[in-house]
């Protein structure tokens, strides 16, 4: 007996099938003008599969912004560099795209006598600079951008920290219009009148702006999460603070790294928080649109050591996914990815330990339309030191594949410091700007709607020092071969292809939005049909096996169950039944094409 209650409430979704092959489509490297150090920090992908990467590139003993565009085949279309007026270090932190193909990059740039300033640039689709907007605090202190987001009208929002020399660092959030004109600026100085640093930003559907980071609250709690909501005019609506459970003699640092907002206006924040005896733990919080805490969830990994959450994403069902790394005594640092339900209940934790039982740090996360989870970062394999490591999990937290990238240098080394980042599939920002030694480290990731995965970061080259290394992966759950079997765990459907000559992807949906049911027959489940599609190229027959629920039928009805295939040319439901397994509740049929399928019973 197999109950269908698990998928009846989710019947409109397509689900990725359980066996998936990952294919490296291309790798492109960007080496700046002096064969010196180039580090990709953020990326975005447009609807046509064009890929945009930004980072810092060394030239004449200083770093410049360097932004590149690649087409869907990985061919460079243009590269644009920006050297600020101070002719010194310029560090981009985020990239975003608008609906018209314009590209926006932000970060911090050394000014002419103004130390570091915010520097936001707009390029058109051909890489031609449209405007540069700089922000310098009146005290000429260091102004450092950490994050950016765009709205549908092309307005640009940036946030970070600004040093005013009196109250030290303050949150500083700025809104520009599409022409680069500053519309408003909002600052936040916390109750401790000390360092306050905004690390991430998000928008809701109503134009409200949400910023999070850390704020010094005083000697008792030190740095706390501080999350702020502004309306579209920059007016502060609320501030929500979170202080973890530790206190003296512990450091009591609580540092928020990432934020996202769901379709209902729920606000999710994650980072790391001092737990006292448990050291630093993941701490994830959900607020409603009024800033009222809905739940908080902490994660302490094995060994009561350092657990740092770097990124968060929420799917359309309200499940929250967090990733970062967790330290223990046996395998050092491992990726640790967690799924929470809408009430903050932990559903699963998936860890990834590379080959060396050494340091593995996840930097960013994304979720596809089927709630499969993708995580990237860098992993120590013991032989060639740090490599890119990208992991796919299904919606149950089971590891489906791991893709690693080892650059051409294969030099021993280790990246220095802690990586932090946020992801919303359009924008990624990350922490430490320069690793200390030779390695390959992935910082940023994006997905497209075709299921392709894009990863970028810094990779040590052969005589070129560090280069951008950007990778496109595709996925196939239906690979070439004979008797190829794919199984959907949600709907209990298994397909067996006689021959697949061209690999592709197969999806199964249980839906009420299909052709009318066969006349005079009842469908199982009620009023539902199965829509099955594939992009694979196949020959000969496909066997379809569907699990059914027999709780509302007699034994006589079960013995007459039919599996039917919809034929659009004749508007008929054809009987394709080959056998019934009434012990395991599976019905089988054969078809030469994929379409809508239905399990029917005579009322």
Language-model features: locations:
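Short, ordered beta-strand-loop transition motifs
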Residues: 489-490, 516-527, 579-586
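Surface-exposed loop/edge segments in extracytoplasmic proteins
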Residues: 569-578
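Proteolytic processing hotspots in large secreted/extracellular or virion-associated proteins
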Residues: 479-483, 513-570, 601
């Amino acid at each position: 007996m197999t109950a269908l209650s698990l998928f009846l409430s989710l019947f409109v979704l397509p689900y990725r099938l359980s066996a998936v092959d990952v294919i490296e489509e291309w790798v492109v490297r960007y080496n700046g003008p002096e064969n010196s150090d180039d580090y990709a920090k953020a990326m975005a992908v447009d609807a046509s599969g064009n890929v945009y990467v930004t980072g810092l590139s060394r030239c004449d003993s200083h770093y410049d912004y360097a932004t590149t565009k690649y087409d869907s085949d990985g061919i460079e279309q243009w590269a644009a560099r920006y050297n600020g007026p101070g002719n010194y270090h310029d560090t981009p932190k985020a990239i975003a795209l608008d609906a018209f193909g314009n590209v926006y990059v932000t970060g911090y740039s050394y000014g002419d006598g103004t130390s570091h300033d915010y520097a936001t640039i707009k390029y058109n689709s051909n890489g031609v600079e449209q405007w540069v907007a700089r922000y310098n605090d009146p005290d000429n202190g260091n102004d450092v951008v950490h994050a950016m987001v765009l709205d549908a009208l092309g307005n640009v929002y940036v946030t970070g920290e600004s040093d005013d020399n009196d109250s030290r660092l303050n949150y500083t959030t700025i809104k520009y219009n599409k022409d680069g004109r500053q519309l408003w600026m909002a600052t936040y100085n916390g109750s401790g009148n000390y360092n306050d640093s905004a690390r991430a930003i998000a928008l809701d559907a109503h134009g409200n702006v949400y910023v999070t980071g850390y704020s010094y609250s005083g000697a008792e709690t030190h740095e706390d999460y501080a999350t702020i909501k502004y309306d579209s005019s920059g007016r502060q609506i609320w501030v929500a603070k979170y202080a973890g459970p530790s206190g003296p003699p512990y450091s009591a640092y609580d540092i928020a790294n990432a934020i996202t907002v769901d379709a209902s206006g729920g606000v999710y924040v994650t980072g790391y928080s001092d737990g006292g005896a448990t050291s630093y733990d993941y701490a994830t919080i959900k607020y409603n649109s009024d800033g009222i805490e809905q739940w908080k969830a902490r994660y302490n990994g094995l060994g009561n050591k350092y657990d740092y959450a770097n990124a968060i994403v929420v799917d359309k069902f309200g499940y929250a996914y967090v990733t970062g790394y967790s330290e223990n005594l046996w395998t050092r640092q491992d990726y640790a990815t967690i799924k929470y339900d809408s009430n903050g209940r932990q559903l699963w934790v998936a860890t990834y330990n590379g080959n060396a039982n050494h340091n593995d740090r996840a930097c960013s996360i994304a979720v596809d339309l089927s709630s499969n989870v993708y995580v990237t970062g860098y992993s120590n394999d013991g032989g060639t030191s740090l490599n890119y490591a990208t992991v796919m999990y299904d919606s149950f937290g089971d590891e489906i594949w791991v893709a690693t990238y080892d650059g051409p240098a294969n030099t021993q080394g280790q990246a220095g410091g802690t990586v932090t980042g946020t992801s919303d599939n359009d924008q990624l920002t990350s922490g430490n700007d320069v690793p200390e030694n030779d390695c390959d480290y992935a910082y940023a990731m994006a997905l497209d709607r075709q299921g392709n995965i894009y990863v970028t970061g810094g990779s040590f080259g052969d005589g070129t020092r560090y280069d951008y290394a950007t990778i496109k992966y595709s996925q196939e759950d239906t690979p070439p071969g004979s008797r190829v079997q794919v199984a959907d765990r949600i709907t209990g459907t298994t397909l067996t292809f006689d021959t697949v000559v061209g690999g592709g992807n197969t999806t199964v949906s249980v839906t009420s939005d299909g052709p009318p049911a066969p006349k005079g027959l009842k469908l199982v489940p009620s009023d539902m049909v199965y829509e099955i599609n594939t992009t694979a190229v196949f020959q000969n027959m496909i066997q379809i096996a569907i699990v059914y629920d027999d709780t509302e039928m007699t034994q006589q009805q079960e013995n007459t169950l039919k599996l039917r295939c919809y034929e659009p040319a004749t508007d008929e439901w054809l009987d394709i039944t080959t056998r019934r397994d009434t012990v395991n509740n599976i019905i089988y049929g054969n078809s030469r094409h994929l379409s809508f399928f239905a399990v029917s019973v005579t009322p």
